[in-house]
From Swiss-Prot:
Part of the 30S ribosomal subunit. One of its GO terms (biological process) is translation. Gene3D superfamilies: Ribosomal protein S10 domain (3.30.70.600). It comes from Synechococcus sp. (strain JA-3-3Ab). Involved in the binding of tRNA to the ribosomes. HAMAP family: Ribosomal_uS10. The lineage of its organism: Bacteria, Bacillati, Cyanobacteriota, Cyanophyceae, Synechococcales. InterPro entries: Ribosomal_uS10, Ribosomal_uS10_dom, Ribosomal_uS10_dom_sf. The gene is rpsJ. PANTHER family: 30S RIBOSOMAL PROTEIN S10 FAMILY MEMBER. This is Small ribosomal subunit protein uS10.
């Protein structure tokens, strides 16, 4: 029995600012639609929350602490049946510096 393997591109995006992440996702989906590919997403993944506990005083008073947190927002976009035009358009796409992108073929 022959299985139909469909080619897809999986794009994982990470950012500290969710607004930058959403605008980047919109640009990628719009580019994929213009080149007649089929985008699925953006699919939101769980936000990672990293807490840092720091002493306020430089030498004493261990009871006084300050907490900082960093939130990492993540999204996945799948692009099915991409053409060479789709890949070229995605390579030329200008995205903000605060967004980390991983592409898997």
């Amino acid at each position: 029995m022959a299985t139909l393997t469909q080619q897809k591109i999986r794009i994982r995006l990470k950012a500290y600012d969710h607004r930058l992440l959403d605008t980047s996702c919109d640009k990628i989906v719009d580019t994929a639609r213009r080149t007649e590919a089929v985008p699925v997403g953006p699919i939101p993944l769980p936000t990672r929350r990293r807490l840092y506990c720091v002493l306020r005083s430089p030498h004493t008073d261990k009871d006084s602490r300050e907490h900082f947190e960093v939130r990492t927002h993540r999204r996945i976009i799948d692009i099915y049946s991409p053409s060479s035009k789709t890949i070229d358009a995605l390579m030329k796409l200008d995205l903000p510096a605060g967004v980390d992108i991983e592409v898997k073929l």
